[in-house]
Amino acid sequence: MTAQAMIVDGTDLDAQASALRTVSPRLHRCLDPVRLTTTASAALDRSVRDFGPETTGGRGGAYVRAQTTQLAARADGIRALLGLFGPAVRHPDAVVLDLLGGNGLVRQVNDLFGLIDAEILTCDGAPHMVSAAWAQGSPAVLQQAQHLVVRDCSVDGVLLAYGTHHIPAAERAGVAREARRVLRAGGVFVLHDFDVGSPMDTWFAEVVDPYSATGHRYPHLTRTVIGDHLAAAGFRGYRVTEIVDPYVTTAPTREEARLRLGRYLTDMYGLVRAEAELGPDGASAWAARRAEEIFRFTTQDGVPARPRFERTSDGQWAYLVPRPALVGTAVK
């Protein structure tokens, strides 16, 4: 359901609602006019700085560049997450909210691979991300995950992924309550994060925090905390499990695939201090090497997981860097 690329002001909720009415009446019907007005002042969150443009001290420009140049780098994890919505989104008018949607990556991957038929509304608290999403054909609305501008019982799925730890710990339970509020009966909430002490937690602490301009000191969730939030929100049926959510880059040679992974990581996390120290190519090689050292673990089934190369069906080399992630799935 690829939409036309548009220039829409990421700070202007009225402009976003108007554009949404034009490109997708289905998504526009999900918006709550009262909340659009009363929640506008609370729409911005702390990720405004992290995911703003570099001119304001953020890493938003590099983040968007990473997703644009390597659109499929996180496709395996996105495929697994969207698959968890199951029958809830298998009807002609299904809608999924992507609460931390950034520049619309989940929708764009879904459009590319045809993973689910539901229409995805990208949501984010950073105006720069909302503008970027519209510019790349992903309809988007500026809103905090804990203060949605969406009607009660109006959507079939809610995804909270790839940034859950950015939400202040005291407000995370409120996100689960908001997700349940906007879901129809039988709708599904999928909550994803990287466990405390996981390789991703180590990556943020040892690489992103010291080598990015924004730092990265956000407490991650645990299996128990995810379950507690889902139960407290009133979900009667839920489960928490682990998936492998890899980075994957492809190229004609093994070394090029590896360096593309390093470039992707350098852009994705805004590792500007590594670039200043080592230069762009040196920073890419360094980031790939650190990923090889950090992303080594044993899955919940007891299987060792390590970075590896694979041949693709068209003769390219794929470089896979596995990441364990926790996922809570709850049905209203």
Roles of regions detected by a PLM:
Residues 5-36, 237-332:
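Conserved Class I S-adenosyl-L-methionine
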Residues 2-92, 105-109, 129, 190-213:
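Conserved class I S-adenosyl-L-methionine
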Residues 173-188:
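A short glycine-rich, Lys/Arg-flanked "PGG" loop and its adjoining helix->strand segment in the class I
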Residues 97-147:
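Class I SAM-dependent methyltransferase SAM/SAH-binding core
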Residues 218-234:
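Short alpha-helix
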